[in-house]
Amino acid sequence: MGTVSSRRSWWPLPLLLLLLLGPAGARAQEDEDGDYEELVLALRSEEDGLAEAPEHGATATFHRCAKDPWRLPGTYVVVLKEETHRSQSERTARRLQAQAARRGYLTKILHVFHDLLPGFLVKMSGDLLELALKLPHVDYIEEDSSVFAQSIPWNLERITPPRYRADEYQPPDGGSLVEVYLLDTSIQSDHREIEGRVMVTDFENVPEEDGTRFHRQASKCDSHGTHLAGVVSGRDAGVAKGASMRSLRVLNCQGKGTVSGTLIGLEFIRKSQLVQPVGPLVVLMPLAGGYSRVLNAACQRLARAGVVLVTAAGNFRDDACLYSPASAPEVITVGATNAQDQPVTLGTLGTNFGRCVDLFAPGEDIIGASSDCSTCFVSQSGTSQAAAHVAGIAAMMLSVEPELTLAELRQRLIHFSAKDVINEVWFPEDQRVLTPNLVAALPPSTHGAGWQLFCRTVWSAHSGPTRMATAIARCAPDEELLSCSSFSRSGKRRGERMEAQGGKLVCRAHNAFGGEGVCAIARCCLLPQANCSVHTAPPAGSGMGTRVLCHQQVHVLTGCSSHWEVEDLGTHKPPVLRPRGQPNQCVGHREASIHASCCRAPGLECKVKEHGIPAPQEQVTVACEEGWTLTGCSALPGTSHVLGAYAVDNTCVVRSRDISTTGSTSEEAMAAVAICCRRRHLAQASQELQ
């Protein structure tokens, strides 16, 4: 007792006053935070046991949701630096509690992350943020925020290749080798559609429902999760009828959850993977919240551990890059279309769009299991349903080829999608070029796909308008950057170049004086055993122009790019190709630096294809033939009217300004120049490399 009295004499005055609150207030505090008193008793010993860190300015950063109504102030995810040891995570949390107590504040550590990322979840006053940001090992702190379910049988026919279509949907493989984790509401697991196919885990991390009169009817609480489980693996209305599922409850009966709850759910999956490794694993996240750095980082960690993550793009008729986890590059992000392959409209809102969307899938009036009874069905709409379709397709593809990486799976999903079927007028004008015109479909066959050259186009975020502003587009870790281009709506840009960053090539685009910003466009391909390099020629300064070659005989040209250090009155003349004579060279303006992407890989061969027009038009295109894949796209000759060149599926598109306002002449005709590549059969390629 004497020892306890001694410790009490050390308590800060504000804490002492807090403990002397009236009985009603004390009981309320005890009900809400039952272990606070135990924490207070330990604070003094914590202070004695922890050496004070030297005072220093905060180098960590603070982040919070851009949408104020979704913010949850008072709860924060403290993310520690990458190299932080497990013991240091717990020590940092204790240090925060001890230093907060000295200032008269109570804190509560809600969760310590170890397996997903180093850090912890803490309940504390926002007044302590400055203190927390100065703690050793802290990388950044993010305020918790809300996430929401994204839902407001033509669908099975739409995703099935014609050769499999019949009176009944019968996929080639049911996804029996794959396990799908669903982060959603609770599930009615005894529904006939999913009975025996879904295991409801004991994981639950949800906020309280809003409103004191909310009644938690089972049918309401289970509605969203039950429907999506049926879409993924239902006996009658499911995509991957053989896939097994595990459900984690991260959304409450109103379809609302938190970023922190989702993080803890993802860590639960990671722990399960570590304890009992299984075959291919797909995680379906049919939810969306405001942009979250920590949620995107967690998705990256899980993806690099071999997990395929599929998420809803969101139902806000907005740029998907403003939401998480939709904006995470490692996640397969899915928008929603209707039976006519058009974007889904949900009242005044609808599917999200933009460069962060990978593809679209059926998401309107989708028939699935209803939680009203064990034999009931209901139709629901939204990007949640679209994501469930892609999760089912992914499960089936992984069941056939379980060794597929995330990059290989994504490339196959894109390659086998239905193309150019969506009416782009539905999207805002500035988003049409960025949004993929792809609707998911099952591959007709995987035979021979291993030697197919798969490529996709990755757009960067739009740069700022300053002269020195740049934009960077990156490929996935398992992909090769084969070419780099740029696009500016004003036409004022200083070009682009491929450069090394963090051991990987990236595509960097440069804005010009008076420009409105620029986008970088990377052509990212799967090219196993590739040896690629970038050859650069500085400005020639005189003569016909600057030119650069792929010097090695076994290397082929996959892309050309150029950039200017100094503006030429805001114009840009990108590199051109001379297919006659020396096809392995890029030729550009004499005042520009020219870059050639040169690669060697088994069976790789490339050729140049050009399509010109006698007078300027707003757009000119050239496409690679069947069996060839577009790797590079540029403009010829590249006058000041050219806005940029970019790849859309297997077509090179060159855009120019509205010719009615530019006073163009026939001397300013332009052409689209494509580099088309393919990989020949293994036996033939092996002979050539010997």
From Swiss-Prot:
Subcellular localization, as worded in the UniProt entry: Cytoplasm; Secreted; Endosome; Lysosome
Reported modifications of this chain: Cleavage by furin and PCSK5 generates a truncated inactive protein that is unable to induce LDLR degradation. Undergoes autocatalytic cleavage in the endoplasmic reticulum to release the propeptide from the N-terminus and the cleavage of the propeptide is strictly required for its maturation and activation. The cleaved propeptide however remains associated with the catalytic domain through non-covalent interactions, preventing potential substrates from accessing its active site. As a result, it is secreted from cells as a propeptide-containing, enzymatically inactive protein.
Signal peptide coordinates: 1-28
Domain Peptidase S8: 153-459
UniProtKB keywords: Apoptosis, Autocatalytic cleavage, Calcium, Cholesterol metabolism, Cytoplasm, Disulfide bond, Endoplasmic reticulum, Endosome, Glycoprotein, Golgi apparatus, Hydrolase, Lipid metabolism, Lysosome, Phosphoprotein, Protease, Secreted, Serine protease, Signal, Steroid metabolism, Sterol metabolism, Sulfation, Zymogen
Main location: cytoplasm
Modified residues (Sulfotyrosine): 36
Residue ranges constituting the Inhibitor I9 domain according to the UniProt record: 75-147
Active-site residues, record numbering mapped to chain: 184, 224, 384
Phosphoserine: modified positions: 45, 686
Chain positions covered by the region annotation C-terminal domain: 448-690
Entry's Gene Ontology BP terms: apoptotic process; cholesterol metabolic process; low-density lipoprotein particle receptor catabolic process; proteolysis; regulation of neuron apoptotic process
Superkingdom classification of source: Eukaryota
Gene Ontology cellular-component terms listed: cell surface; cytoplasm; early endosome; endoplasmic reticulum; extracellular space; Golgi apparatus; late endosome; lysosome
Family per record: Belongs to the peptidase S8 family.
Domain remark in the UniProt entry: The C-terminal domain (CRD) is essential for the LDLR-binding and degrading activities. The catalytic domain is responsible for mediating its self-association.
Listed name of the protein: Proprotein convertase subtilisin/kexin type 9
The organism of origin for this protein: Pongo pygmaeus
Encoding gene per record: PCSK9
